[in-house]
Amino acid sequence: MMPGLKLYGALILCVLVLPFSRPSSQVLDCREVRSSFQFLYPGMKWTPETPVSGSDLQVCQPKGLTCCSRKMEERYLLIAKQNMESSLQATSAQLKGLIIQNAALFQEAFDMVLRLGRNSTLMVLREEFPGLGAGASGAVTQLFLDMSLYILGSDANVNDMVSTFFSRLFPLTYRRLLGNGAVAGISEECLRGAWKGSSAYGSFPKMMMTRLSRSLLATRVFLQALNLGIEVVNTTQHLRAGRDCGRSLLKLWYCPHCQSLLEARPCRPLCVSTMGACLGGTTEVQPHWRAYVDELGSLAAAMKGEQDIEAVVLRLHVIIRQALKQAVASKSKVSAQVSGMCVHAPPRVSRAVPVSAEHTSASTVNHNRPPMNFDPDETLFGRRREFISGLRGFSQFYSGLGEALCSKEPTSLNSSLCWNGQEMTDKFPGPGLKRVHPHGSESKQKTPEPVISQIIDKLKHINQLLRMVTLPEKRWRARQGGGGARRNPSGPGQTDEDEEGLESGDCDDEDECTGVSGLGPPPRRKRLRIFADLADNLAIDDLTLHELLLTPRLATDAHGGSSIPGAAHVPTAAFIFTITIIIFITLGLQ
């Protein structure tokens, strides 16, 4: 009786222990591997019916038998590279979308500011100086066209733009506004340059040059930096996996399939090392990218006062109006100086064209017209601050790119095991166990790819340019000594009301004069109408589609099956054996 009980006890022990054992050489079942592969490549029947030696495999070389053929390995290599590229595009999509959307918004907003500035200037000339006629309108239109082309990257010089504008405006000013008419002996060409020698417009042309130079240059560099940011991210997003990278990805993701481990997940150190090697040295971009974000933020914070295109251009009509009023106030002096410079024949007295009532009323019309300014909250400064705040969230983008790609790996059902490139191993080895380190070509540090070296050089260049544009503003403000009182540029006759908009460095909102860093989330503020319109047209699609293209959610997931990594088919065989033993015991007891 006792020997029989011992036999039954031994059999019961086998029943309990066998299903949970993990043999070193498990029996492979290639049926699920075939189903998984045909899900990826329908109609392809390259999966062997039974395990084979795998002697022709180049990467997924087994210690024993395998369920993969050489053609399967080639196909797995191709899809591994595609998954890597799709995952990289999805990871970069949010950053790329942020820069692209804001570049388009700012481009259109700057164009809108120029259009509003042009319209307000034309309105001033039409209402306050109607005698200047269509010629003045043409000069204004050309000036703003040149400004628009400049911020887009033209080789024009801002000082030359302003000089050309006043050169076209002065003959009209001299003949129509100052009442000199068609004076004999004075050529049009001489009049074009006479405003400089006669100081007809006072210091206002120089003031206009200074403000436009600073604001337009800052705007131009800001847009240039945004476009370069798009290029940098776009280059990274479209990196292609090379031969060595493809082999490493194959070993990382699909070699477990050959061992019928369809739900095996790679160990984290191996994944990070492999991604780092495949990214072609993009970690070298990180310090330059971080400097790019910081320098762009510094420029955005400095773009106020004389470096803010909105503040300068929307008040440009004030400077032009004061310049014309300066010429009218100095009519006798200007006329005499122009005659001395341009009249070569003996001067003869000519009857001056009387100044019409519409000319004399110029100084009173402007005070009855409402100011043409934006709502103080609808500022480009606020929008720039909001953009920089979002961009700072990506300041470590390149240092964590490999980690981000590995974070998109689906979690395994058995959290204690992972694939180390050769076999399933403990994900968290105990203190007495040797930790498996990544090995092979993927762990070697390589020099950056040529395309990465190119974007590093471009980042260095734009960072230097951003510093050059930002630093002069800091030095200029230091020289101002905190913004003391200015000398009235047009003499004692100009009132404070006339100088509206001419104070440099003014801030309409105290909060807007602070820097960007350390402010936390930007306050919710009104947007320029163009922002509201473009936000709908340029909205970035969600990344659901991209998420579906990430590193392989293995084909067995689609069939609804799930198993423990490292033991995909052992439980099935053990279950059958267990049922057999139970039946045997039952019959024996009977």
UniProtKB/Swiss-Prot annotation:
Signal peptide: 1-25
Domain of life: Eukaryota
Transmembrane segments: none
Region annotated Disordered, chain positions: 429-450, 476-520
Keywords: Cell membrane, Disulfide bond, Glycoprotein, GPI-anchor, Heparan sulfate, Lipoprotein, Membrane, Proteoglycan, Signal
Phenotype of gene-disrupted mutants: Morpholino knockdown results in severe defects during epiboly with most embryos arrested at 60-80% epiboly.
Bilayer topology annotation: Lipid-anchor; GPI-anchor
Composition skew (Acidic residues), residue ranges: 495-513
Subcellular location: Cell membrane
A GO cellular-component term linked to this record: side of membrane
Disulfide bonds: 30-67, 60-255, 68-258, 190-342, 245-278, 267-418, 271-406
Keyword Disulfide bond recorded: yes
Residues the record marks as carrying a glycan: 119, 234, 414, 504, 517
Tissue: Maternally expressed and is almost ubiquitous during blastula and gastrula stages but becomes restricted to the prospective hindbrain by 24 hours post-fertilization.
Pfam family, one: Glypican
Protein modification: O-glycosylated; contains heparan sulfate and/or chondroitin sulfate.
An annotated GO BP: negative regulation of smoothened signaling pathway
Record function comment: Cell surface proteoglycan. Negatively regulates the hedgehog signaling pathway. Positively regulates the canonical and non-canonical Wnt signaling pathways. Binds to CD81 which decreases the availability of free CD81 for binding to the transcriptional repressor HHEX, resulting in nuclear translocation of HHEX and transcriptional repression. Inhibits the dipeptidyl peptidase activity of DPP4. Plays a role in limb patterning and skeletal development. Modulates the effects of growth factors on renal branching morphogenesis. Required for coronary vascular development.
Subunit relationships: Heterodimer; disulfide-linked. Cleavage by a furin-like convertase results in production of alpha and beta chains which form a disulfide-linked heterodimer.
Family: Belongs to the glypican family.
Name listed for the protein in its UniProt record: Glypican-3
Source organism of this protein record: Danio rerio
Gene expressing this chain: gpc3
